[in-house]
Swiss-Prot record:
Tree of life domain: Bacteria
Originating species: Chromohalobacter salexigens (strain ATCC BAA-138 / DSM 3043 / CIP 106854 / NCIMB 13768 / 1H11)
GO terms for MF: rRNA binding; structural constituent of ribosome
Gene: rplW
Protein known as: Large ribosomal subunit protein uL23
Function: One of the early assembly proteins it binds 23S rRNA. One of the proteins that surrounds the polypeptide exit tunnel on the outside of the ribosome. Forms the main docking site for trigger factor binding to the ribosome.
GO terms classed as biological process: translation
SUPFAM superfamilies associated with the record: Ribosomal proteins S24e, L23 and L15e
Length: 98
């Protein structure tokens, strides 16, 4: 995987209250590209953070339907990945994951 693809796969951290609780169990949540696969996400995290990844779980979040002045509209959906690191590995520079 080339360096350019690494930065296109991981779009950024997804920080929520649920993600903060998951970080306590060595699981970190990232927003990822719609076409990203589990092996790509694993390689991207290992290349970017230099940590060993134990597993990756991926899910698609559907956009919400919202009413507008002109009828119904649809918000954009996204894809997120729960990345579990190997035992003893943590991401210190992961903001908000204390």
């Amino acid at each position: 995987m080339n360096q350019e693809r690494v930065f296109k796969v991981l779009l950024g951290p997804h920080m929520t209250e649920k993600a903060a609780f998951a970080a306590e169990n060595n699981q970190y949540v990232f927003k990822v590209a719609q076409d990203a696969t589990k092996p790509e996400i694993k390689k991207a995290v290992e290349a970017l953070f230099e940590k060993k990844v134990a597993g990756v779980q991926v899910l698609n979040v559907k956009g919400k339907t919202k009413r507008t002045q002109h009828g119904l509209g649809l918000r954009k959906g996204y894809r997120k990945a729960y990345v579990t690191l190997a035992a003893g590995e943590t991401l210190e520079d992961f903001s908000g994951a204390e």
